[in-house]
Amino acid sequence: MSNHIFTGSGVALITPMKSDGSVNYDVLGDLVEFHVQNGTDAIIVCGTTGEAATLSEKEHCETISFVAEKTNGRIPVIAGTGSNDTSTAVMLSKSAASTGVDALLCVTPYYNKTSQQGLVRHFNVVADSVDIPIILYNVPSRTGCNIKPKTYQELCKHPNIVAAKEASGDISQVALIRSLCGDNLDIYSGNDDQTVPFMSLGALGVISVFANICPKEMHDICQLCLDNDFAEAQKLNFHYLELMLSLIHI
């Protein structure tokens, strides 16, 4: 697969709020400009860090539309549209696709303890509903559900399922996914601290929390990996490792 959604550092963008709990679009617009100007390679809106699980459907759709319009094609925008309810995931995905975003990020159904075959059916229904690329999002520590490597192998047969954000924390699983899926499925690290080892296995970058505050630094780490300078990338990774890990617990 020659066309990638992005390579490098994609920020898992926060969703700023006003004191009354509404989305602060003025600050959100400033954040988009901050990332465009400071080396971020893609913006992921309404993901876990963007509090997708606690936004209303209206807020969710409006936030995606705002970020897509504000970014205006300067860097890729990826919209989080996953849900534990297939029909809601389809609705959010169709709404996001209509705004002109470049791709969708779809988390595994949470709480339901879906079977592996259930995952295949769920994601294929979502992928059938749109005409843009989908990044699967595997974060079993939050969802209670892990996409197994052979399930990835089945899922990437769908032409719209082209990538995965792997936040399982299991480097052996990532190696097996790469072995089974090869170039049919792009991999992005879902954990900042594991970006370098994941990229040494062929991942294309990271969907990053750390990039919210250090966009250039995360971009530089990824670029060094893409340039096969893993020794220098690891030096930078070690330098920022404590900060990266602290952000997991905020």
Kindly give the residue locations of the regions a language model identified.
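Conserved small/polar residues in nucleotide/adenosyl-binding loops
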Residues: I248-I250
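Active-site beta->alpha loop and helix N-cap motifs at the rims of alpha/beta catalytic domains
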Residues: N3-V11, M17-G144
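Catalytic alpha/beta core domains of metabolic enzymes, predominantly
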Residues: R142-M244
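Structural motif
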Residues: M1, H35, A96, Q153-C156, ...
